[in-house]
Structures are given as C-alpha cells and as structure tokens.
C-alpha cells in the first residue's frame, strides 16, 4: 500500500522559532522530534512573502507571476493543475483542514452582507480536495456577519461573544494588532485546538482503504499576537531577546515609498522594546500550541497504527519579522519574512540530517507528488528533495520570490531585491558575511557587476 502523507502547514511561522533550529527558549518538542527522525532544511524560500501567492505556488509548483497571483486579491483558478489532483489520480484520498485562502471572499463581509465559510467548500474542492473544512484568519472572526465551523463551535460553548470582543480590540492594522495579549479562551477552545480535534475526528472516521494526503493548515502563529493562557503564562517571565529596532535603508525613491507602506503596516510608532518583547512572548506561545497540537495528531496516527506508514512534511507559507529591522509580519525579502521552516520525516523515521542546500516551496510540490508515486502537476518547477532524507543534495543555484511590484532572489552568497516598476535594485546583502542583513551593498561601486548579473537573472526568471 502507498504511504500516507501528513502535510502540516502553519501560517506565518518564522524559520528559526523552533528548538531544532537553535532557538534558546521556544518549546517545540514535537517538531524537534520530527526533525530528529528526518531532514531539516535550513535555506528554504517561499515564492511570495504573503499568503495567497505563496499558497498558489505551493499547490501548483509554479511561480506567482505565472499564475497572475502576486498579492492577496484572489485569482485562484480551479482549472490549475495541482498536486492534489495528481495525488487523487494516483489513488489518494485528499483532505484539507484549516486555512486554504484560495478565494476572493476571504475578506471581511461587506456591510449588510454575510459569508458562511462552508459555502466556499465546493470551490476549494475543485482544486483537488475530497474533504474540506476551512477556517479564516482570527481577525476576520471579529465580524458578526461571518459564520465558520469555529465560530459555531464557540457559540455552542457560549464563548463566541467573548472571543469576538477580544479580536475586535486587535482588529487588523491597528496598534493593538501587534500588542501581545493573553486569550480570553481556555486552551481547549483555541482555534488550533479546534483544528487538531477536527483532524482527529477525520482520521478516526475514515471509511476507505485508500492512502490519504491530509493537509492540516493551522491559522497560527499568524497575528493577532494572542496566545492561549497556558503558553502565555509559560513565557510571561522568559528572557526574550529583542532585536535591534533599526529600520531598513531607503536606497531609492520607490523603495522608500514601499518601506513607508511596511512601516505603516507594522505601526512602527508603537515599536519600543517593551512593546516588541510582549508581542514576541505571545508569538512563542502560539508556536508552542501549534507544536503541542501536532503532537496530539501524531499520537492519533500512532494509536491508529498509521504513523509508521505516513510521511510527515512541515512548512509554512512565509515567515514573521518579529520586530527585526523594526518590522512586523512579512511582505519583504529579509530572511525573517521569506525563509520558512521545512522538515520531512519518512515513515518509521530516519537518522537526523540537516540540509543546507537552497530549496524553494515549489520543491515541496514536487516532493509531495514523488511521495505518492505521481507526476508533478503540469508546469511545476519544483524538484523533489526526497533524496535529502538520506544524503546531501545539490539544491538550487537561485531562489526567487515576489510580492506585487517587488521581487527578490538569492544565490548561495547574496540576496537582491528589485523594484519591477522601474527595474531599479533596492537591496543587496552578503548572506555569508552579513547573515543579519544589516549592511546594504546595493549602491557600492564594488557591487555593481554582481547587482547587474543578479538583476539580469531575476528579469530572465520573470519573463521565462
């Protein structure tokens, strides 16, 4: 029988906020255990540092500019070849539980209108999912005009009004959006707990002998920065390392304008040491809860006798800046934003490996197909990285990412950012000598040839 696939997809998980990645404080014993029995990749880029383009790229293995999805404005096409459709054709039952973010209605309901999340299930299924249970970002739950499986669950427990009141206080892009808070809900009613419970039920109620490809898509640790009471208390007195709050250098007028957008998004006027420290505490708590719930799902698989026949793949759509360079969230090409965790564990486990080759999330697309004995979807640019479980791989020469009219790329030594409107380079960092990306070399005379070479390669990528 073909192996099962558990594809765990977090939202906005920064690449180094795991014990196995060397973080000195965060508690992630289950992710660490997966890494101890598999391979952890240290240089994985998402194809866009924002939700929808990244997710479009993951399911197709194609780049955002090819799909015409370069921002969070929708545009997903059910006719796209996807890895889920390929796996269905290879005999798999496919299921997604959590956030997909495929459709344009993934926005707050307009005045007078209502949205029931379940009305979108047919659209999501058309991408190759047999079973769909979808949820929204927490901040969209603030609207009383929105109904989701989770809001109904909270209503049944008499806690929906309490929850909505707190989420409204931290509604998107206000200063409170980034203020660390403790949830008014007990841990067992948290959204991550709900999604893990739904996953447990799905696994136990399956009535087919087909192998499964199950995507468990957590909504956390995406903002708002609200952790459950248990983990919030755990990190309350932890010694938090707050990064220097120095803003990026505005090297060109176009880049200066975009940095102003990022600054406004991050509400930088609120960003002093204590404010950022409080936010990081809650972020660590959300990561630890996701890890805890992963452990519960793995325990269910073990109880059902399925763990030793299941590949586990863990990653995220993009990262989180956590105050670094005086920014929150993503939407830029700093490592904190564009690099994501990637861990792959084979059935039964394998000796732990760390893989430093350059890898993209398009490679995850090809890898999922490879696990299931299927061909990658048509147009997929990914390369399967299954071989990395056993030995070093060559990896890629270049990595690419794009959001709107800005694009980033890197090779083994340098990272470049370019404004596509006027084709001007904005950033160049030496990733080996300056891993903190503190010294922008883009306007140095000694960098001119390298900037031109990388810029030409980036333009060629975008026009191929």
Predicted features and spans:
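Formylglycine-dependent sulfatase
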Residues: 1-420, 424-426, 435-456, 460-463
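Short, well-ordered alpha-helical segments
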Residues: 429
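Residues forming the ATP-binding cleft of Hanks-type serine/threonine protein kinase domains
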Residues: 432
């Amino acid at each position: 029988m073909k192996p099962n696939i558990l594809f765990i997809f977090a939202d906005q998980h920064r690449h180094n906020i795991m014990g196995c990645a060397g973080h000195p404080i965060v508690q992630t014993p289950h992710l660490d255990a997966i890494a101890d029995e598999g391979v952890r990749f240290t240089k994985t880029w998402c194809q866009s540092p924002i939700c929808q383009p990244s997710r479009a790229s993951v399911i197709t293995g194609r780049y955002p500019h090819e799909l015409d999805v370069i921002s969070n404005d929708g545009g997903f096409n059910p006719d796209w070849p996807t890895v889920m459709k390929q796996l269905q054709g290879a005999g798999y039952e496919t299921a997604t539980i959590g956030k997909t973010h495929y459709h344009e209605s993934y926005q707050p309901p307009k005045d007078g209108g209502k949205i029931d999340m379940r009305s979108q299930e047919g659209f999501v299924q058309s991408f190759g999912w047999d079973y769909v249970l979808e949820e929204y970002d927490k901040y969209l739950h603030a609207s009383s005009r929105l109904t989701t499986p989770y809001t109904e669950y909270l209503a049944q427990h008499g806690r929906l009004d309490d929850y909505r009141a707190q989420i409204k206080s931290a509604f998107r892009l206000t200063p409170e959006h980034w203020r660390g808070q403790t949830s008014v809900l007990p841990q067992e009613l948290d959204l991550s707990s709900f999604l893990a419970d739904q996953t447990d039920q799905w696994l136990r109620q399956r009535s087919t002998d087909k192998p499964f490809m199950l995507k468990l898509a957590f909504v956390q640790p995406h903002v708002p920065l609200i952790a459950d009471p248990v983990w919030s208390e755990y990190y309350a007195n932890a010694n938090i390392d707050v990064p220097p709050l120095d803003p990026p250098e505005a090297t060109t007028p176009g880049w200066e304008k975009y940095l102003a957008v990022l600054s406004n998004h991050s509400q930088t006027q609120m960003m002093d040491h204590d404010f950022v420290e409080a936010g990081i505490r809650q972020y660590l708590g959300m990561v630890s809860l996701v890890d805890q719930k992963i452990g519960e799902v793995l325990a269910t698989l073990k109880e059902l006798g399925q763990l030793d026949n299941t590949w586990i793949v863990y990653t995220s759509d993009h990262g989180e800046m956590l105050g670094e360079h005086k920014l929150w969230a993503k939407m830029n090409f700093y490592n904190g934003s564009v690099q994501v965790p990637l861990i792959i564990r084979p059935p039964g486990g394998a000796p732990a490996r760390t893989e430093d080759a350059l890898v993209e999330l398009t490679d995850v697309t090809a890898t999922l197909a490879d696990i299931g004995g299927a061909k990658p979807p048509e147009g997929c640019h990914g390369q399967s990285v299954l071989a990395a479980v056993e030995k070093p791989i060559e990896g890629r020469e270049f990595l690419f990412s794009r959001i709107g009219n800005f694009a980033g790329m890197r090779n083994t030594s340098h990272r470049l950012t370019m404004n596509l409107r006027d084709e001007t380079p904005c950033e160049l960092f030496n990733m080996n000598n300056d891993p903190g990306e503190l010294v922008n070399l883009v306007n140095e005379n000694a960098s001119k040839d390298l900037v031109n070479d990388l810029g030409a390669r980036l333009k060629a990528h975008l026009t191929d």
